[in-house]
Regions:
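Well-ordered alpha-helical segments within folded domains of soluble proteins
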Residues: 80-83, 197-206, 306-310
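Primarily interfacial, aromatic-capped hydrophobic alpha-helices that serve as membrane anchors
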Residues: 121-156, 262-321
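N-terminal, motif-rich segments that launch catalysis or mediate targeting to/interaction with membranes
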Residues: 6, 12-45, 104-180
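Acidic, Mg2+-coordinating active-site segments of isoprenoid diphosphate-utilizing enzymes
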Residues: 92-114, 205-299
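Aromatic-acidic/polar surface patches that form glycan- and anion
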Residues: 76, 80, 195, 226, ...
């Protein structure tokens, strides 16, 4: 395992032909029937994200998996993780695209419940400003995921931790709304503290452990440290591939834009209005050009390298679990992020 600075090497490897091959491998990827059905229903809602996203997530899910999952559970785990991402995306769409906080709060109650609590809001009790159809679909996605997870061999051991970690994703989404509404309050430190959890990799780990062949409770602390590094690396890859699109949409919560704000490269008053009521493409393109001139993307790749080295150190300390495949998988995830720029 080479623990130097692979990010730049990965970035250089994603040339036009290689990027096209990676993208085609995603487009050719088949979703399992359960997931295909949920995605088809999701796409009936206005503003739904394209099929490519779900093919991308499902194809890459094994790269984010800890090597504790038995071969007979790998497909189930990949599907469960993709269903989780679909649920998170439903919530993301509500606050980032629709600014529908009432519906967001209604759906969030599903996650904030204890496992044995009753449904927090029957359909007939929705307030008038809550999108009941959207909540009903979100409930279907969430209960489908829980029903599948309950069949996992070690579900009971990790169920409460899973719910806790999913709640951190909700906090990450809520922090994003703070940044969008008040970009002058955004800091990279807060992004790393809160928003990075939007990647959901702690919850991914919980799912892996539910389907583990053995009991890895004794390695849980080290595994969560490893996931922390991997999640930051995944967040950087996501920022690199989406920040320009998000800026044009008025979402200024990416690490690149927040860094530009902190350094005074752009001012809060220059940012596009998140309500999408005006054509801001020209103004956004000017900001993008200015940010690109300062090469902030290279700085993020350097940060990625730092997390990679931390992950390598953790791998060397791990005796009970071979973290090598997870470490190597982070490079593939970065490669696919960079190849999919402009497609997600």
């Amino acid at each position: 395992m080479t623990c130097s600075n692979p990010a730049q090497t990965v970035a250089r490897s994603v040339d036009g032909q290689r990027a096209a091959e990676l993208l085609q491998s995603v487009r050719d990827h088949d979703l399992p029937p359960c997931l295909r059905s949920l995605v088809a229903e999701y796409q009936t809602f206005e503003g739904a994200r394209p099929l490519f996203i779900w093919q991308w997530v499902h194809r890459l899910a094994p790269k984010n998996a800890m090597p504790v999952v038995g071969d007979d559970h790998r497909e189930t785990v990949a599907t469960n993780k993709t269903i989780l991402v679909l649920f998170v995306t439903i919530l993301d769409d509500l606050v980032e695209k629709r600014q529908d906080y009432a519906t967001f709060d209604a759906i969030s109650r599903l996650v904030r419940l204890r496992a044995d609590d009753a449904d927090p809001m029957p359909t007939e009790t929705f307030r008038s400003d809550v999108d009941g159809e959207y909540v009903a679909f979100a409930r279907t996605v969430w209960t489908t995921l829980l029903d599948r997870l309950e069949d996992a061999p070690r579900y009971d051991r990790y169920a409460s931790l899973f719910r806790f970690d999913v709640r951190q994703i909700l906090t990450a989404i809520e922090y994003t709304t703070v940044v969008i509404d008040s970009p002058e309050l955004a800091t990279r430190a807060d992004l790393d503290r809160y928003e990075t959890h939007n990647m959901g990799m702690y919850s991914y780990l919980d799912i892996d452990l539910m389907y583990a062949d053995g009991d890895h409770a004794g390695s849980l602390s080290l595994l969560r440290d490893a996931v922390d590094a991997g999640q930051r690396m995944a967040r950087i890859g996501n920022w690199l591939s989406t920040w320009e699109r998000e800026l044009r949409e008025g979402d200024v919560s990416s690490g690149i834009v927040v860094t530009a704000l902190e350094r005074g490269l752009v001012g809060p008053e220059e940012l596009p209005d998140p309500d999408g009521s005006a054509d801001v493409s020209v103004a956004a393109d000017r900001l993008i050009d200015r940010i690109v001139e300062h090469d902030l993307e290279s700085e993020l790749l350097d940060e990625w390298n730092g997390e990679y080295r931390r992950l390598c150190t953790l791998s060397e300390r791990s005796d009970a679990v071979d973290l090598g495949p997870f470490v190597e998988g982070t490079k593939d995830v970065l490669r696919y992020h960079l190849a999919s720029r402009g497609f997600k």
